[in-house]
Amino acid sequence: MSKKVQKVVLAYSGGLDTSIILKWLQTTYGAEVVTFTADLGQGEELEPARRKAQLLGIKDENIFIEDLREEFVRDYVFPMFRANAVYEGQYLLGTSIARPLIAKKQIEIAEKVGADAVAHGATGKGNDQVRFELGYYALKPDITIIAPWREWDLRSREQLIAFAEQHQIPIAKDKRGEAPFSVDANLLHASSEGKVLEDPAQEVPDYVYSRTIDPEAAPDQPTYITIDFEQGDAVAIDGGKMSPATLLAKLNELGRANGIGRLDLVENRFVGMKSRGMYETPGGAILLVAHRGIEQITLDRGAAHLKDELMPKYAELVYNGFWFSPEREMLQAAIDQSQRYVTGQVRLKLYKGNVILVGRDSAYSLYDQDLVTFEEGAVAYDHRDAAGFIKLNALRLRTLGQRRKKLGL
């Protein structure tokens, strides 16, 4: 504490940990606490967070609860899916993409109420502390950041419970013991980590899953759907136009019912350790296959291949917390430019955990059936043209072959 903090904006869920943090900020810093609770589609009633904050002495004018579902999907999830961003080949970045928006709103509230500090509940071992704080510093370089898990001496669940009881913080009965795993959720995904999941050799228990049914229990008949895209963004399901958040919620329902989107992953954290997580991204898994499908017929080969080369870097930037960095914005500009003609419709079959692309159509399609057909047509491909193409591409290989022959290699 290098300077006296007067007012701090806390990212507040209303749960036990952030309620303890709230009281700890009051007692340790003597600061006025402002709470911010974001509705990102986590599926929880948020009014209890307001009542909990009031119970802990927070004035009504210092309690902020915002429905950010549309902004989250429109301005964060959809731009990321234009890139087909996947971290380490599998992770759809559901937790990572939520942190920049929360950080942005905290800074906006801090400026509105005249706060000189922000605080979060991320631990000192994970990626979220980095993601939050990179966002804070990018948007308000002079802000003071308080990370209680890196400062306090509450090192065990027993100590946390004792602190809560000492300060009359309500504790749900199921929170008195160690939780079997921790959960983070928003409209894009639900992730579970820790405790029963820490041994990567052990199968994930059934009770961990919250957003998907077991693929083996999914219907024996497939579900067919169509998704319409306009300039890279999904806009309709089965012909019905929807807002971004409503559309993703509908895809979540469809994915859940068909056992789609489960991922058991050991990932490389930015902070240097490996961690195991159980991710459920039903709607996102469908959206990724659909977007790739419409790109197959609307993107030029060179643009498509360049996008594929850039994607891992884009995904890494999002995962590591560099959403507000110039390099992410540069990549986004290039990706968005590539999406000008990514408009059309894809047809999908959802079946027992699988998303199967069965059709795609676009007024901007680059697919020419007359060129690829084995039958003769009006503009049929002349097979003889291939000989010169192959010889020119083989020129350097033939030259190398001549050298090997000359040297007896």
Curated annotation (Swiss-Prot):
Residue ranges of the TM segments: none
User: Any idea which positions bind L-aspartate?
Assistant: T123, N127, D128
Name its pathway: Amino-acid biosynthesis; L-arginine biosynthesis; L-arginine from L-ornithine and carbamoyl phosphate: step 2/3
Q: Which amino acid positions bind L-citrulline, per UniProt?
A: Y91, S96, N127, R131, S182, S191, E267, Y279
Q: Which UniProt keywords apply?
A: Amino-acid biosynthesis, Arginine biosynthesis, ATP-binding, Cytoplasm, Ligase, Nucleotide-binding
Compartments, record wording: Cytoplasm
Query: In its keyword annotation, does this UniProt entry include Nucleotide-binding?
Result: yes
User: SUPFAM superfamilies given for it?
Assistant: Adenine nucleotide alpha hydrolases-like, Argininosuccinate synthetase, C-terminal domain
The reaction(s) this protein catalyses: L-citrulline + L-aspartate + ATP = 2-(N(omega)-L-arginino)succinate + AMP + diphosphate + H(+)
A GO BP term here is: argininosuccinate metabolic process
- Gene Ontology annotations for the cellular component aspect, listed alphabetically: cytoplasm
Instruction: Give the matching InterPro entries.
Output: Arginosuc_syn_C (IPR048268), Arginosuc_syn_N (IPR048267), Arginosuc_synth (IPR001518), Arginosuc_synth_CS (IPR018223), Arginosuc_synth_type_1_subfam (IPR023434), AS_cat/multimer_dom_body (IPR024074), Rossmann-like_a/b/a_fold (IPR014729)
Q: What is its EC number?
A: 6.3.4.5
Amino acids binding ATP: A11, Y12, S13, G14, G15, L16, D17, T18, S19, A38, G121
* Any GO molecular function: ATP binding
Gene3D superfamilies assigned to the protein according to its UniProt record, in alphabetical order: Argininosuccinate synthetase, chain A, domain 2 (3.90.1260.10), HUPs (3.40.50.620), Single helix bin (1.20.5.470)
Q: What is the superkingdom listed in this entry's lineage?
A: Bacteria
Q: Which family does it belong to?
A: Belongs to the argininosuccinate synthase family. Type 1 subfamily.
- What PANTHER family does the annotation carry? ARGININOSUCCINATE SYNTHASE (PTHR11587:SF2)
The subunit field of the Swiss-Prot or TrEMBL record says:
Homotetramer.
What protein does this entry describe? Argininosuccinate synthase
- The source organism is Nitrobacter winogradskyi (strain ATCC 25391 / DSM 10237 / CIP 104748 / NCIMB 11846 / Nb-255)
Classification from the root reads: Bacteria, Pseudomonadati, Pseudomonadota, Alphaproteobacteria, Hyphomicrobiales
The gene name reads argG
